[in-house]
């Protein structure tokens, strides 16, 4: 059995017209991920429709239609192998759920690839590009690469490419605290397949790696085993002859049988008897492990989804109130003091009230634009004071980042995303 490659979750971000899906499609196609039979069939259809010469776009459209027809080739589609990693492509922003999933941990991206159109150097950066970068920065994604796409539309000009690199570096990346010197920029033409997987012969001036080689320069996610134990509860079962079995995913720290544990905000404690995953007993559970465990001294009625488990010497923080930095993504009107939407943090969903709007920030630079604003609207970034309407666990993002981020939902949509930068504990 060959050792499995580590999994790397990569978010592809950028303006919708920059050629994001073409870039993803090209990576999947040229790395041999899409079933050759499907490609053959689409090639045949292309030539029957007089589109011979195997047009890549036709394959991409064909895949899109397959999805619309409900054929399940979606999964294979979103994964490909590089030399070093099994790369999972995390759905890009634009999907409303992307933000919620990123924050609730369903699909934490380890790195991001920003896809830009080289022609933006002439027309200016798209606002969506700024928003996406600001968002992944807020969500704690620090590894970034940039694919400068559509090089075929500027005759593979080094000058145009450099102009785009300069504009991104000076007008965006530096402002958001990324150091452009540490970021790989790659000139690509995804439509024709230059520099995605196959090295291009059209840009002799570019000596650097292809996009897939750049993905291999990202660091694998580190397991935060050195942080205090935190495990949000996803569900609680009662199993005959065993007792209460909570299930969830360890976010930080390590949990072992025999450990004394505390659940907050429930305020109950117990002792771990056994830990299981896929019907096998485990000697310990580490970050990323989805496990069920049997706990002595805790009844099914005592704990619920949204409670967080920790060790007695460092219990999860129950917030009386907290200060947060948020970015408002979409809202039909405005947010004012007294607004009480639902906060989604780890597995908890709790209505929380905006007590103070302290500062409005420039979303591109983080600088203070206005003290004590009267309201916030879509596109604003701000520092606010929040009070949960019932007990909830949230941590300072500087101490335990995995439990410091949240999405704010209202009217069936994600209206804002943010992180807790200071918390006043009720239980410490």
Curated annotation (Swiss-Prot):
Residues that hold Mg(2+) according to the record: 21
Start and end residues of each stretch annotated as G2: 70-74
Keyword Nucleotide-binding attached: yes
NCBIfam families in UniProt: EF-1_alpha, PRK12317.1, small_GTP
GO terms for cellular component: cytoplasm
Region ranges (G1): 14-21
Compartments in which it is found: Cytoplasm
Record-given protein name: Elongation factor 1-alpha
G5 as annotated region, ranges: 189-191
Chain spans, region G4: 149-152
Protein purpose: GTP hydrolase that promotes the GTP-dependent binding of aminoacyl-tRNA to the A-site of ribosomes during protein biosynthesis.
Binding-site positions, GTP: 14-21, 91-95, 149-152
InterPro entries: EFTu-like_2, EFTU-type, G_TR_CS, GTP-eEF1A_C, P-loop_NTPase, Small_GTP-bd, T_Tr_GTP-bd_dom, TRAFAC_GTPase_members
Chain residue ranges for the region called G3: 91-94
Family assignment from sequence similarity: Belongs to the TRAFAC class translation factor GTPase superfamily. Classic translation factor GTPase family. EF-Tu/EF-1A subfamily.
Native source organism of the sequence: Methanococcus aeolicus (strain ATCC BAA-1280 / DSM 17508 / OCM 812 / Nankai-3)
Record field: catalytic activity: GTP + H2O = GDP + phosphate + H(+)
């Amino acid at each position: 059995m060959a050792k499995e490659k580590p999994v790397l979750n990569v978010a592809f971000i950028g303006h919708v017209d920059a050629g994001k899906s073409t870039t993803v499609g090209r990576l999947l196609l040229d790395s041999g991920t899409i079933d050759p039979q499907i490609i053959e069939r689409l090639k045949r259809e292309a030539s029957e429709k007089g589109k011979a010469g195997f047009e890549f776009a036709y394959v991409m459209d064909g895949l899109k239609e397959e999805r619309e027809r409900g054929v399940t080739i979606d999964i294979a589609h979103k994964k490909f192998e590089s030399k070093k990693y099994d790369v999972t492509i995390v759905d890009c922003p634009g999907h409303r759920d992307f933000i919620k999933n990123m924050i609730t941990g369903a699909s934490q991206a380890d790195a991001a690839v920003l896809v830009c159109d080289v022609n933006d150097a002439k027309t200016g950066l798209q606002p969506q590009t700024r928003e996406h970068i600001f968002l992944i920065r807020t969500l704690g994604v620090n590894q970034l690469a940039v694919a400068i796409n559509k090089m075929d539309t500027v005759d593979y000009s080094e000058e145009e490419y450099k102009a785009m690199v300069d504009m991104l570096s000076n007008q965006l990346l530096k402002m958001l605290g990324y150091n452009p010197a540490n970021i790989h920029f790659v000139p690509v033409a995804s439509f024709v397949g230059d520099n995605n997987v196959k090295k291009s012969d059209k840009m002799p001036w570019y000596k650097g790696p292809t996009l897939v080689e750049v993905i291999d320069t990202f660091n694998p996610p580190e397991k935060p085993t050195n942080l205090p134990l935190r495990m949000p509860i996803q569900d609680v079962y009662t199993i005959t002859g065993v007792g209460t079995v909570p299930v969830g995913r360890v976010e930080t720290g390590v949990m072992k049988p025999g450990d004394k544990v505390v659940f907050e905000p429930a305020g109950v404690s117990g002792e771990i008897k056994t830990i299981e995953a896929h019907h096998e007993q485990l000697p310990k559970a580490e970050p990323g492990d989805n496990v069920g465990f049997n706990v002595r001294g805790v009844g099914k009625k005592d704990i619920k989804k949204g409670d967080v488990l920790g060790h007695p010497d460092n219990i999860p923080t129950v917030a009386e109130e907290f200060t947060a930095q948020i970015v408002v993504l979409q809202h039909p009107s405005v947010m004012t003091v007294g607004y009480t939407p639902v906060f989604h943090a780890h597995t908890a969903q709790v209505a929380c009230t905006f007590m103070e709007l302290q500062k409005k920030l420039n979303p591109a630079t983080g600088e203070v634009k206005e003290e004590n604003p009267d309201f916030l609207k879509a596109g604003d970034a701000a520092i606010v004071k929040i009070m949960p309407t019932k007990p909830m666990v949230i941590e300072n993002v500087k101490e335990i980042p995995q439990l410091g981020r949240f999405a704010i939902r209202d009217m069936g949509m994600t209206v804002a995303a943010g992180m807790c930068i200071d918390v006043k504990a009720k239980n410490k």
